[in-house]
Amino acid sequence: MSKSPWIIHYDGSSCNGCDIEVLAALTPLYDAERFGVVNTGNPKHADIFVVTGTVNEQNISVVREIYEQMLEPKVVVACGACACGGGVFHDCYNVLGGVDCAIPVDAYVPGCAVRPEAIIDAVVAGIGILDEKAEAMKADPAAKREPGAEGAKGAHGSWAQVQDAAGAHGAGVACETEGEQA
């Protein structure tokens, strides 16, 4: 990648434990900037979308809007048990599930709360995925990734991808979007 990857962070409905860990990962103690990571508040400038918390009826449109405003290529990282599958809030009346109920996810970071080191590992893995997507776009400029085209886990998404680095174990949870199983 010829430029530093810019990330945008969004916290859905959660206990804010993972949200705090994402912020901790951006502090000098963990020094995410050594990988060239820059935090931005503008989706049009972001390459990597880091999401914590669940997707619910109130924030699903926000999650989708941020995703759609990002330019291709883009990577989505779901951080924490809530973002991966709904977590402890999964059975709440307004919770639809994890991030993959709304948009395709490329990397999952299970844990409650997820460790800052695991978040950094996922973002670094996301840089590799971003490079792959950029190369694919050069090879086929007409190809564009549509939400849901690769299934619930996205083109690269898997539990094992970041699970070993995270040192945590997660389990997939089926989610419901508009009454259908994803």
Sequence positions of predicted segments:
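Iron-sulfur-associated redox domains of electron-transfer enzymes in respiratory
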Residues: 1-182
